[in-house]
Amino acid sequence: MDKSQGVLLSSNVGAGSRPWPELLGSAHWDGLLDPLDLTLRRLILLCGDLCQVTYDSFNSDSHSRYCGSCRFSRATLLDRTQFPAAGDLSVAAYLYATSDATAFPGSMVYSMSREAWSKESNWIGYVAVSNDAAAAASGQRVIYVAWRGTIRSLEWVDVLKPDLVDHDDILPEGHPGRGRSRVMKGWYLIYSSTDERSPFSKYSARDQMLAAVRELVARYRNESLSVVCTGHSLGASLATLCAFDIVVNGVSKVGDGAHIPVTAVVFGSPQIGNPEFKKQFEEQPNLRALHVRNTPDLIPLYPSGLLGYANVGKTLQVDSKKSPYVKRDTSPGDYHNLQGILHTVAGWDGKDGEFKLQVKRSVALVNKSSGFLKDSNLVPESWWVERNKGMVLGQNGEWQLEGPAEENLPVPPVVTGKIIDDDVAAVATSSSAKEGKKTGKGSKLLSGLIDQLLCVPDTCKAGAA
């Protein structure tokens, strides 16, 4: 039985497919987007489902003590979310973020409990890598960085202030973008902020990510390596920023050799920065971005060029209105829904072509967290839910929220070692964009080796959280 849902498996890479560098945009996807190349289509769906894992595993119930955390351990994340390529990847690290609630309303959720696991941090994504079997089958060792988007409604668009700020803190000394390249404050604070009050945010999401990617690049330096950053909505902005960061700070450089390719594959992305950021991004020879955009979705138009923003990378434009499976009259949020976009990718045959599923992918996935499908498909709305919303009947006869099993409890990231090498990029020391105990400085120079941040199931004891 085909359970791949159309995503790229290690067994699909090789004979009959375009070379891996081309799929990652080495030639800017010339000749691959219209018509949409089959292997690239599968890679896009793989990235989309990596993003979906962040939604399916995120605890957003404010009644739970563990609201804002991931429901599953690294060892079980992909299996528990029924990720179709779970047999090909191992989750190496979890990423946690903190941010001032006023910087990006709706980006963080917190428990109402006085005994909450954290009052300052949220799980924001993960780093995964091809396991040994998949790398051997495909000839590629791929590091994936998946960022979670906001789980709130699109009301955040009305209240989010699109202020542009410099990101000199994450640019090396002497970089031509310093003082000129600017990104949206909301994205940047989530990416680069720390909070000493939280053991999960003593290091920024950025620091956690860079440490994880650097260690994996060092571990697999003798193999054919690449990095793919992916995200949807807010996560798309973080993925684009993170891909840029990896390249300009030399994390993609293998020893004294060349830089490995780094690609952002993003969905429904708001605009990230000003024209100078776009220029600096697109001038990097080993850096690419592919933005999958649904035509009726308005979020990619935000904040707009009128406010000083510019689009980054190549765009694959699809249109969900061509699908015969979805409603014609629907809410704006449905056009932005990730599974709606992935469904459209699965059946896309160009602007003038007929919509027809080109890979086997369940139509029911569209309604995973929406009501976008026509009622005639007989699929209930928003069907991906915890059984009884996590309520269980206790031995005392009382119904109560069930806490996570011990192996699924949140574990603070431990980062030791240099996040940025001194001889590759110097860490800027400009003032923080935030006040108080939270800081927006993107990097910390630490001594020693990276330790305990990563636990890849291929090499670590089974069952590690």
Swiss-Prot record:
Its EC number is 3.1.1.-. It is found in: Cytoplasm. InterPro entries: AB_hydrolase_fold (IPR029058), Fungal_lipase-type (IPR002921), PLA (IPR033556). One of its GO terms (molecular function) is phospholipase A1 activity. Keywords: Cytoplasm, Hydrolase, Lipid degradation, Lipid metabolism. GO terms for biological process: cellular response to UV-B; lipid catabolic process; UV protection. It is an enzyme of class 3 (hydrolase). Signal peptide: none annotated. The active site is at 233 (acyl-ester intermediate), 233 (charge relay system), 297 (charge relay system), 336 (charge relay system). Its main location: cytoplasm. It holds the Pfam family Lipase_3. GO terms for cellular component: cytoplasm. Acylhydrolase that catalyzes the hydrolysis of phospholipids at the sn-1 position. Belongs to the AB hydrolase superfamily. Lipase family. This is Phospholipase A1-II 5. The lineage of its organism: Eukaryota, Viridiplantae, Streptophyta, Embryophyta, Tracheophyta.
